[in-house]
Amino acid sequence: MVKGEKRSEMMLNLFGDNSEEEEIESEHECNRRQPNYASDEAEGGVEPEGEGEAEVEVHGEAEAESDGEQGDVELDPGESEGEREQSSQEADPQEESEARDSDSDNKEEEHGGRVAKKRRQEVVESGSERSGEKHYESEDEEVDQTRSPRSPSEEKEEVQVAQSDVNIRNVFGSSDDEDAEEYVRNDVEQDEHRSPIEDEEGSEKDLRPDDMVLDDIIPEEDPQYESEAEHVEARYRERPVGPPLEVEVPFRPPPGDPVKMNMIKVSNIMGIDPKPFDAKTFVEEDTFMTDEPGAKNRIRLDNNIVRHRFVKSRDGKTYSESNARFVRWSDGSLQLLIGNEVLNITEQDAKEDQNHLFIKHEKGILQSQGRILKKMRFTPSSLTSNSHRLLTAIVESRQKKAFKVKNCVTDIDPEREKEKREKAESQNLKASTKLSQAREKIKRKYPLPVERRQLSTGYLEDALDEDDEDYRSNRGYEEDLEAEAQRERRILNAKKSHKGIPGRSSMTSARPSRRQMEYSESEREESEYETEEEEEEKSPARGRGKDSEDEYEEDAEEDEEERGKSNRYSDEDEEEEEVAGGRAEKDHRGSGRKRKGIESDEEESPPRKAPTHRRKAVIDDSDED
């Protein structure tokens, strides 16, 4: 206490104005940071000349006392710098209170204070020249010794920083002393740029160190290379602290053990109904598959849809009941039974997919139910199952053939081929028309005789008409046939009796040759217009015609011979019979031609001559036939 009173008296004598108190505080801080300077001043320093010697000596004693106090503080070499600063800060508030009480006395000693101020500046300069062994680590430390005056609140902050430095030292050990010193210096620099309002806010923030981030407390290693923007960002970042949020979320327990949860993909062979089953409102679902032509194929999915319903037990508890269940067999295989349908299950590992199950609540809140680690795949159990038949129906509907336009490339021009075919058809048509015209022309020129007529509708109709004739006509025809047969027999008998006559035989042989030549020429003309079939049909008929003509000629010759040998009366009778037979045949032929509407050439034949020319008349008839 004695030392404190002496010190206060000396300060009152030395400092008269309040403005000089700030200089005293800065000087004390310099003395605390540089104790060597104070020891040099205690030894005597430089003695001034002229007036003011007593005042200078008093100042030297005061400095000696302050040095003595500092020497007491420095007796413990193991004490840290933070503790020394703390002790010096505790003495400063007492000095400030005593200085404020003696404001009235300070006015009288203004002149002495000014002289002491000049002396102190000289002492500081001399001390800095003598301290050649100590060097500053950075320019920031030199600036700290000559910083501007500070308010009491700033000094309190320094005390708090020193305390936090001690706490950090106790936590991290003595090896972090350098980092702590840098932290104190950076804190002082930041405080210089802050306003009093920011200082008050900073004091309130210092009371809650738990809200600060550890990365912001520890400064960077090289603060001298920091820019202004980085220096501003180095301020303390606070965690956002506000009123607690109150959200009401219904708690839903997870559906099961996460190890047993699996993810499945619903395919076309099975389905899941998310709505609970109700027999009153249940409606069967029908699925329609549309193929390419647009037809709809109805496919029912009633037997392989998983459904559930809520049932109450006897205790009154509600639980869910499903129509599906899993079955694991002794061999390790797993199957799903949906009613009467059986599906095989294959399991796959899905750890790499990172699948999680969440329940979505209101206001964007998700409740996790667990992680899904496996996948399941369903396949039909057999070829006779309903699911397999469903799959086959879908495949057939998709692969059904549709009518499409097919493109093909050919080397042949279809237009030219069509023209060639049309031309060939037209040529065939022309040839057929020409052939039909030629046949009609031949038929008109050479009509067929009655004997040569073939079976046809007209011929058969004529035969029916002949059946309708009366019995007399048939009887006359039979009589004519009998007469002709008798005539042939007589002719044969006559030939046998007259074989020995040579002249007659030569004449008869010459005449048929002439007739054959005539018929050959006519046949040549007919061959040019008739087909082979007509030639085949006509050739035997001509042969028969020739035979008949030869017979008529022979008959005529034989008749002449017989007339020469027999009586004229008998000959005339025979000739009359022959003429009557020929007339009957001609009448019969004419009647047949009239029924068919064919004009005969015999009607236009010239009139008959006298009986002396009977042979010639017979020959003319054969030629006409």
Curated annotation (Swiss-Prot):
Residues 97-113, 121-137, 182-197, 415-425, 471-491, 538-547 have a biased composition (Basic and acidic residues). Expressed in roots, shoot apices, stems, cauline leaves, inflorescence apices and flowers. Its main location: nucleus. Residues 40-55, 63-80, 523-537, 548-561 have a biased composition (Acidic residues). Disruption phenotype: Early flowering, defects in floral morphology in whorls 1-3, but fully fertile flowers. Reduced seed dormancy and increased germination rate of freshly harvested seeds. GO terms for cellular component: Cdc73/Paf1 complex; nucleus. The keyword Transcription applies. The keyword Coiled coil applies. Keywords: Coiled coil, Flowering, Nucleus, Phosphoprotein, Transcription, Transcription regulation. Residues 1-214, 415-625 are annotated as: Disordered. Residues 426-436 have a biased composition (Polar residues). GO terms for biological process: flower development; negative regulation of flower development; transcription elongation by RNA polymerase II; vernalization response. The modification Phosphoserine is found at residues 203, 548, 570, 600, 605, 622. Residues 492-501 have a biased composition (Basic residues). Residues 415-539 form a coiled coil. It is found in: Nucleus. Belongs to the LEO1 family. Component of the nuclear PAF1 complex (PAF1C), which consists of VIP2/ELF7/PAF1, VIP3/SKI8/WDR61, VIP4/LEO1, VIP5/RTF1, VIP6/ELF8/CTR9 and CDC73. Interacts with VIP3 and VIP6. PANTHER family: LEO1 PROTEIN, RNA POLYMERASE-ASSOCIATED PROTEIN LEO1. Component of the PAF1 complex (PAF1C) which is involved in histone modifications such as methylation on histone H3 'Lys-4' (H3K4me3). Involved in regulation of flowering time. Required for the expression of the flowering repressor and MADS box gene FLC. Involved in the control of seed dormancy and germination. This is Protein LEO1 homolog. It comes from Arabidopsis thaliana (Mouse-ear cress).
